Amino acid sequence: MVSDGDFYRQYLNGDDAGLEALMEKYGDPLTVYLDGYLHDIHEAEELMLDVFAYLFTKKPRIREGGFKAYLYKAARHMALRHRSKRRLMFSLDALTDSLPFQ
């Protein structure tokens, strides 16, 4: 059986099939995990793609056997940042809506 680390190394060696296999394996569960933070399935799907895009562009070093933990930790940090930005945006919208017209 091929491990997550094998798929990731395959991708790092230039074979995109490794990343595709990881996306196939973790895409849906990661989306559900992110939806738990965002409470919006569409935003969760977009953020899941952002997590994999991060892996695609940055190609971080991940210790052996730690791919899943790394993936979910990165997803959690991205979700918390996204939620924080969304909360700030809503706060600013509420502030501007409450201003009287001059």
Question: Which sequence ranges carry the predicted segments?
Answer:
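Residue-level preference for hydrophobic side chains embedded in well-ordered alpha helices
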Residues: 22, 26, 30, 51, ...
